Each structure stands twice: as structure tokens, then as C-alpha cells.
């Protein structure tokens, strides 16, 4: 189950653990609740889709 909350975060609930994704133009991050670990991943590690 996932939804975007009022702050623009993408909330994904998996087996009772909520993942909050934070996406910007250069990186994507997510933290789990609980526990709230913040993980930031640069977007350039993902291959860009062909245009």
C-alpha cells in the first residue's frame, strides 16, 4: 500500500513498516517508521529510461 502524504512524501506500508520516500531532482531518500533510519540514494546510480 502506498500513498503520497500532504508533505509530498511517498508513504509505502510493507508488513506494518512504513517507508517514507523523499524524492528530489538529484537524489531519493527514504526512512522507515519504526525505526526511522534515513537513507539517501543519489539518483545517478539508477539507469535513466530510454527516451
From Swiss-Prot:
Induction line: Expressed in the late phase of the viral replicative cycle.
Entry's localization field: Virion
Domain of life (superkingdom): Viruses
Positions annotated as glycosylated: 11
Keywords: Glycoprotein, Late protein, Virion
UniProt family annotation: Belongs to the asfivirus I177L family.
Protein name as it appears in the record: Protein I177L
Amino acid at each position: 500500500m502506498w500513498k503520497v502524504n500532504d508533505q509530498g512524501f511517498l508513504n509505502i506500508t510493507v508488513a506494518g513498516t512504513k517507508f517514507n520516500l523523499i524524492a528530489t531532482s538529484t537524489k531519493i531518500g527514504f526512512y522507515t517508521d519504526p525505526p526511522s533510519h534515513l537513507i539517501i540514494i543519489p539518483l545517478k546510480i539508477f539507469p535513466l529510461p530510454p527516451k
